[in-house]
Amino acid sequence: RPPRSTLFPYTTLFRSEELRRIRRSQEKAMEGAPHESILVVDGTNGQNALMQVEAFDKAVTLTGLIITKLDGTAKGGVLAAITQMRREKPLPIYFIGVGEQLEDLQPFRALEFANTLVGLDPATPPTEKDD
């Protein structure tokens, strides 16, 4: 059996074609559909998460993301990478998962997340430096 990394492109192509068919069915069934195309990404997947975002966006034109598993060793590097990758066409992150329970799914607040990432109080408002 080939390693998972070599399987990824084939499974992605299959999923992408299936998603395109679903999208076409939705468009035929209701004008303006689908209204949202949200991808849930495992925050521990690193570089694979970036490839998933690119592949799924190409297939169905994503409107947002949910990033899970940001409570362990994944401290948000995938968020920074996705932001860097998508500078010309930003993709909103609606929720982040910081645990195993439904209650651990939180609305994503970029400033709070950035403050926490660098060790500041999440509630600290930004300050302007005197020039």
Regions found by a protein language model. Name each.
Residues R1-T12:
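Single conserved hydrophobic/aromatic residue that forms the stacking wall/gate
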Residues N115-D131:
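Non-catalytic terminal/linker segments enriched in charged/polar, low-complexity residues
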Residues F14-G119:
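Conserved catalytic-core segment of NTP-binding enzymes
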